[in-house]
């Protein structure tokens, strides 16, 4: 039986949160550092389940690194080439999508004999579009269980060239190709077919790649020209900014029950798209101030909105919670890719929002929410999804208790989330 956690009603939130490092940036930075030409010192690294899977893989590949959990740092000796495992290997990557997709592309570059696998949910998350793109460049990849889904067997062979990849399901497929193609034998042209989702995550990838010495030219995110036979050049030191998706919970708490909450580690200079979450809160009526590396939110009366949130899919989940405390209807649009995340988030959010008294309409790629007349105590199923657990913790701001089942799923990206939340709460 999974453990549950009951949160008592919170009367006020006030204080400062120093954000943990971004998961998306940490895993990319670990991978690029490992393949770079010398030693890289990473600061403000995130230590969580998802990043541990990447570190475990680096260790198996023979990469030498020294991590300090107290200083949130990691020093990595680059191997100056794509990651490689000389013997037949099976790698278990849990439900770490960023790690799985990027490693699938990198292991396609060398002669390997690797089975990439994951947990039950990972085996339900489609990977066909990435596999097809890698196969176009010569990769030998086969499905070992269900067609179009992990686990996959990788035997190398990817040399680049003309690649077509769908942008419809996940931007991680394109990110993986952008990380791998500079190391391929041939120059590559990557053409994105179908509309690209979560575009800001591509900006994160391009930003990281440029910090490691590689520039990629693109035409409006539809065509990317990549020179092959390049090397990743270590920046010597790289500081990972705070996790903008994780910031959303604390900023939302302030908008609902502030006080004033300041999050540090992200701000005007952030490379993450999810900082735009603060602008959405502002549209809903919250008081927002941006600094270079901080954001402050204060409570004001909130109103519902109708908005396309394709660019901030993770933080958009938090807006679904803010909607419960807002006047009128909220519609979150263009979020089909919620369905292929850690769980089918559209279905899961609909089910759990209804439990606490909200009126909800679930569309194919949107969710419509009317706030409860009265909040109802509920036991929230978290679906082993860290973001659902973190979102629904905010129901305690309603004046009633809330119970979260399997609350430790937050370990995926934010192991001390509940302690951090408690640090700004008055009861």
UniProtKB/Swiss-Prot annotation:
One of its GO terms (molecular function) is 3-phosphoshikimate 1-carboxyvinyltransferase activity. The active site is at 314 (proton acceptor). It is an enzyme of class 2 (transferase). It is found in: Cytoplasm. 3-phosphoshikimate binds at residues 23-24, 28, 170-172, 198, 314, 337, 341. Pathway: Metabolic intermediate biosynthesis; chorismate biosynthesis; chorismate from D-erythrose 4-phosphate and phosphoenolpyruvate: step 6/7. The keyword Transferase applies. One of its GO terms (cellular component) is cytoplasm. Keywords: Amino-acid biosynthesis, Aromatic amino acid biosynthesis, Cytoplasm, Transferase. Its EC number is 2.5.1.19. Phosphoenolpyruvate binds at residues 23, 97, 125, 172, 345, 387, 412. It catalyses: 3-phosphoshikimate + phosphoenolpyruvate = 5-O-(1-carboxyvinyl)-3-phosphoshikimate + phosphate. One of its GO terms (biological process) is aromatic amino acid family biosynthetic process. NCBIfam families: aroA. Catalyzes the transfer of the enolpyruvyl moiety of phosphoenolpyruvate (PEP) to the 5-hydroxyl of shikimate-3-phosphate (S3P) to produce enolpyruvyl shikimate-3-phosphate and inorganic phosphate. Monomer. Belongs to the EPSP synthase family. This is 3-phosphoshikimate 1-carboxyvinyltransferase. The gene is aroA.
């Amino acid at each position: 039986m999974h453990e549950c956690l009951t949160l008592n009603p919170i009367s006020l939130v006030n204080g400062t949160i120093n954000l943990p490092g971004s998961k998306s940036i940490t895993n990319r930075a670990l991978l690029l550092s490992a393949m770079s030409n010398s030693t890289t010192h990473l600061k403000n690294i995130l230590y969580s389940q998802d990043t541990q899977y990447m570190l475990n893989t680096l260790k198996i590949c023979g990469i030498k690194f020294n991590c300090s959990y107290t200083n949130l740092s990691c020093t990595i000796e680059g191997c100056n080439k794509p990651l490689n495992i000389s013997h037949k290997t099976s790698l278990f990557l849990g439900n770490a999508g960023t790690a799985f997709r990027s490693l699938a592309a990198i292991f396609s570059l060398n002669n390997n004999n690797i089975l990439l696998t994951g947990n039950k949910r990972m085996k339900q998350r489609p990977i066909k579009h990435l596999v097809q793109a890698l196969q176009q460049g010569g990769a030998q990849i086969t499905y070992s269980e269900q067609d179009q889904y992990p686990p996959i067997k990788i035997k190398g062979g990817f040399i680049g060239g003309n690649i077509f990849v769908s942008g419809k399901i996940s931007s991680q497929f394109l990110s993986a190709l952008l990380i791998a193609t500079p190391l391929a034998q041939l120059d590559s042209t990557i053409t994105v077919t179908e509309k690209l989702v979560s575009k800001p995550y591509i900006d994160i990838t391009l930003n990281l790649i440029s910090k490691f010495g590689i520039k990629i030219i693109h035409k409006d995110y539809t065509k990317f020209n990549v020179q092959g036979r390049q090397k990743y050049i270590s920046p010597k030191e790289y500081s990972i900014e705070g996790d903008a998706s994780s910031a959303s919970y604390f900023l939302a708490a302030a908008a609902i029950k502030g006080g004033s909450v300041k999050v540090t580690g992200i701000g005007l200079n952030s490379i993450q798209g999810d900082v735009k979450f603060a602008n959405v809160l502002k549209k809903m009526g919250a008081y927002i101030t941006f600094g270079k590396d901080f954001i402050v939110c204060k409570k004001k009366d909130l109103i519902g909105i109708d908005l396309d949130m394709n660019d901030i899919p993770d933080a958009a989940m938090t807006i679904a919670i803010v909607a419960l405390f807002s006047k009128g209807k909220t519609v979150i649009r263009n979020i089909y890719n919620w369905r292929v995340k850690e769980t089918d988030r559209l279905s899961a959010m609909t089910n759990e929002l209804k439990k606490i008294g909200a009126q909800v309409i679930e569309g194919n790629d949107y969710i419509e929410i009317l706030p409860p007349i009265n909040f109802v105590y509920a036991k929230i199923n978290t679906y082993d999804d860290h973001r659902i657990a973190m979102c629904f913790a905010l129901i305690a701001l309603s004046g009633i208790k809330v119970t979260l089942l399997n609350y430790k799923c937050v370990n995926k990206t934010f192991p001390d989330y509940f302690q951090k939340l408690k640090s700004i709460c008055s009861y």
